[in-house]
Amino acid sequence: MATPVVALVGRPNVGKSTLFNRLTRTRDALVADFPGLTRDRKYGHAHIAGYDFIVIDTGGIDGTEEGVEEKMAEQSLLAIDEADIVLFLVDARAGLTAADIGIANYLRQRQNKITVVVANKTDGIDADSHCAEFYQLGLGEIEQIAASQGRGVTQLMEQVLAPFAEKMENADENDRTSEEEQDEWEQEFDFDSEEDTALIDDALDEELEEEQDKNIKIAIVGRPNVGKSTLTNRILGEDRVVVFDMPGTTRDSIYIPMERDGQQYTLIDTAGVRKRGKVHLAVEKFSVIKTLQAIQDANVVLLTIDARENISDQDLSLLGFILNAGRSLVIVVNKWDGLDQDVKDRVKSELDRRLDFIDFARVHFISALHGSGVGNLFDSIKEAYACATQKMTTSLLTRILQMATDEHQPPMIGGRRIKLKYAHPGGYNPPIIVVHGNQMDKLPDSYKRYLSNYYRKSLKIIGSPIRLLFQEGSNPFAGRKNKLTPNQLRKRKRLMKFIKKAKR
């Protein structure tokens, strides 16, 4: 199931942005603001009450009963249409207003949406008496919160996301408390034991085989009019495949199975392309929701940039989402044909300057319209996915760590040198390396970057981000009670199950 989408709507100054920041800050999410495209609308990832979801701040709506639809910006309407859940915020202190009534009248027409009235700013007042008049809106119970203090926010999200629990992958992963699983983990595994670390390597090998057996999912993302539709159609046209459109809800992307050179792929279409070989030159409808969900669901992301335009903050925001999601990356510079050589040189110089922090990604200069360079993309796609899922062992990672520290020792802290003991794999896609040692909390960021670059060079990882986790002592999960993500919980359960079986 696609990640649930929660839209925050309401008139100005009712606390939507405060609630948005409260929700997204729970995961230190990268929040993108797309000026011009979405005006003052903000989109972010959030994790609260055990759920992952996307939250939209739709901005203030100054509507009236007669003209609310005219007053709502097009992007606000789109956000409501794309949302699974609409949280309609009202100000408990200010009371019911004509704008609230107008917005409620519009929302009542959206019968297919879960709509919840949320009375904010209930701190320091008799909330029940102040909220009573909001029942006139005819949208059911009134939920009370104080977003600035966080009061009632977790309970609110638990309630509104509950209908999705059975459909979400991690719904049954949190039945046992983190403390119970932490205790079992610490009892079962000794990370100073070669036998146990070898068993973990074997367990991760099983996970790696599962990853490698999958179709490679490719998402083509980028700003409007950079040529996503043209590139999608060119790829499908070149491969002469039958396109199976499998639309879900109005906000779901289209998943198109295809094959090339014996490798199965799934192309995630966020541009709304439906027919192979038919390129529409009209302005593409840009959906941030489709883009974020496609990035999360993909293995490899093709970030498409228009060679005739400068790299924008929107490009960098999309790039931030890709890196934050840990996805493999290929940079595609489209509309390369017909440019003068001096313009090409200037574009390459600009790419080197603005994108120097992702020098691990391959860059392709193509013309989606004419097809030049498109076929070569698949070499980089396969390379990036292979690097993201390559086999790593504890012995190999520890050996590389030793070489790195021999060449450049960690710094002295308080007269004691930071000691890095060993490393082991923590997962794949993206590659995760867990480094154990003493005084890890004092290890400078510059040295962490050095180790990351050293591992990348030694393992020859191209096109994929690499993540290093630094753990004090021998237990990789020490001090992380209640902080594991659902994916980490699932991974740890698989490891425990595998090693218990192997020890019998």
From Swiss-Prot:
Residues 180-191 have a biased composition (Acidic residues). The keyword Disulfide bond does not apply. Residues 390-474 form the KH-like domain. Residues 4-168, 216-389 form the EngA-type G domain. Keywords: GTP-binding, Nucleotide-binding, Repeat, Ribosome biogenesis. GTP 1 binds at residues 10-17, 57-61, 120-123. SMART domains: AAA. Belongs to the TRAFAC class TrmE-Era-EngA-EngB-Septin-like GTPase superfamily. EngA (Der) GTPase family. Associates with the 50S ribosomal subunit. GTPase that plays an essential role in the late steps of ribosome biogenesis. This is GTPase Der. It comes from Haemophilus influenzae (strain ATCC 51907 / DSM 11121 / KW20 / Rd). The gene is der.
